[in-house]
Curated annotation (Swiss-Prot):
Lineage summary: Viruses, Duplodnaviria, Heunggongvirae, Peploviricota, Herviviricetes
Basic and acidic residues bias (residue ranges): 33-44
Gene3D superfamilies, per the entry: P-loop containing nucleotide triphosphate hydrolases
Gene expressing this chain: TK
A GO molecular-function annotation: thymidine kinase activity
Region called Disordered, residue ranges: 1-44, 260-280
Keywords: ATP-binding, DNA synthesis, Early protein, Kinase, Nucleotide-binding, Transferase
SUPFAM superfamilies found in the cross-reference section: P-loop containing nucleoside triphosphate hydrolases
Signal peptide: none
Protein name stated in the entry: Thymidine kinase
Oligomer status and interactors: Homodimer.
Amino acid sequence: MASYPGHQHASAFDQAARSRGHSNRRTALRPRRQQEATEVRPEQKMPTLLRVYIDGPHGMGKTTTTQLLVALGSRDDIVYVPEPMTYWRVLGASETIANIYTTQHRLDQGEISAGDAAVVMTSAQITIGMPYAVTDAVLAPHIGGEAGSSHAPPPALTLIFDRHPIAALLCYPAARYLMGSMTPQAVLAFVALIPPTLPGTNIVLGALPEDRHIDRLAKRQRPGERLDLAMLAAIRRVYGLLANTVRYLQGGGSWREDWGQLSGTAVPPQGAEPQSNAGPRPHIGDTLFTLFRAPELLAPNGDLYNVFAWALDVLAKRLRPMHVFILDYDQSPAGCRDALLQLTSGMIQTHVTTPGSIPTICDLARTFAREMGEAN
C-alpha cells in the first residue's frame, strides 16, 4: 500500500485528544451521517482529510486558539491556513482593512453618503473574499465523499482554516448592510458567488458574552482596525442568525414556504449566543432570510423579485450541508484549545480523490500561508 505524507504522524493529533480525556461526543448542529456501504468504493481506499474552518466575529480569540491547537500536532499532519493579511494589505489592494473602517467612520460622521460608502465597501469586500474563494476552488477537485463511519481512523492531514469563504461573502457584507454601508442587492450579489459547499465542511462558530468580547477586542492590535462597537454588535447578530439559519434548514425549514410569516421590514433584535442543535427549529424571523425582506428587493406586489429569490435559494443550498459546531470562548486560551480539540473528535472527514491529493493539499496550504500570511 502506498504511503502518504502524514500517515506516519497521523496519530499525534488523536493522541493529544485522548490524553486530555476527550470523547467522541458530537456537538454539531447536525448528527453525523452514517454511510456504511456494503461494498468499498475505490475512493474509500484513499486517505482521509479533516477540514476545520474557525469562524465567527472578530476579536473572540480564534487565531490564538487555533495556533495553540496547531502546536499540538506535527508539521506533517496538521497545517494552518491563516487570514490572508498580506493580500488585504498589499497584494490585492492597499490597506483594505483600514479602508473599510475609515469608510464606515466617515459615513457615521456624515462626511460621505451611504451610496458613496457602499461603493467603497463593496469593492473592498471583493478584495477580502478573493483569496478564500479561489483557494476553495483549487482545493475542491481533491475533496471526495464524506467518511461516514463513526470509527474512521485519524485523518492523514488536518487543515485548520482561519475562516470559511462565507465570512467574506455573506457574514461581513450582511453586517455592513446592517451598518448602512452596503446595499441588500450587493449582499445578495456576494451570496450568489458563494462556492458550492464541499463535503466535510466543519465550521466552528463562537460564543462569548458581549462584555467579554468588547474587552478582548479592545486589547488586540490589528493593522487598520478601529474599535467599532456598533459593527461588533452587527457581526455578532449576523453570526447568531447564521447558526439559526443552518438549524432552520437542517430541520426542514423552507424559506419559500415560510416567507409569508415575515412581516414588515424591521431588522431582527439582538439575539442570544449561537446554540447547538438543542431545542425546536428556529422561526424564519430568527434567520438570515429576514434581513432580505427589504423594500429594495420587493416587487410592487410585495414579493421578492425573482433574481433575488434565486439568490436566497443559493443561500439555502450552500448553508444546508454545513456541519456547524459552537465553541465557548469564555475560558482561558488553553481551555479554548482543549474545547476545540474535543470538538474535532466529532467532526466529519472526507476521502481525497487521488493518491497525490494529500501532498498537493499540503503544498497549497503552505503556499497560501507563505505568500499571504500576516508574517509577510
